[in-house]
């Protein structure tokens, strides 16, 4: 009887303990397209991670100039250089020199969105479950 009670208690605790809290942002409002992008499910869940298209674009495109001691005069950047709202502002207003001088022209609109998703998701102070659409 004691073994049965322990087994039953263990079975009841499994669902409770398996619900892990995830503080990463689940959605992102994009001002350029006026849409709410779901980052926690579907293809964007994968693409907005470091190994997805967003992370690869950051490493291949952005980090080709924005490295330490670069000869292009570009400031050093890493994912946590800005908070999520600041990264959204960068893509909505396109104020950096690299956006104005045509360096972004080699990327499609969808690639820019996925890059913004990645930077938003892993930005400084982005691990706040209340910071989303």
Question: Which stretches of residues belong to each language-model region?
Answer:
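C-terminal capping alpha-helices of c-type cytochrome domains
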Residues: 105-133
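Bacterial N-terminal signal peptides
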Residues: 7-16
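Electrostatic cytochrome c docking/interface patches
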Residues: 25-57
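Detector for the c-type heme attachment site
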Residues: 64-72, 92, 103
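The canonical Cys-X-X-Cys-His
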Residues: 58-69, 115
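Positively charged n-region of N-terminal signal peptides that target proteins for export
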Residues: 1-4
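Short Fe-S-cluster ligation motifs
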Residues: 89-111
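Sec/Tat signal peptide C-region and signal peptidase I cleavage site
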Residues: 17-23
């Amino acid at each position: 009887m004691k073994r049965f009670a322990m087994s039953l208690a263990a079975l009841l605790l499994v669902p409770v303990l398996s619900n892990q809290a995830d503080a990463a942002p689940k959605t992102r409002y994009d001002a350029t397209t006026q849409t709410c992008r779901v980052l926690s499910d579907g293809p964007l869940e994968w693409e907005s991670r470091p190994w997805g298209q967003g992370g690869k674009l950051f490493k291949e495109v952005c980090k080709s100039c924005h490295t330490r001691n670069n000869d292009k005069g570009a400031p050093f950047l890493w994912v946590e250089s800005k908070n999520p709202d600041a990264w959204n502002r960068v893509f909505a207003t396109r104020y950096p020199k690299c956006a104005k001088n045509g360096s972004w022209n080699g990327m499609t609109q969808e690639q820019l969105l996925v890059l913004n998703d990645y930077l938003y998701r892993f930005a400084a102070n982005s691990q706040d479950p209340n910071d989303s659409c």
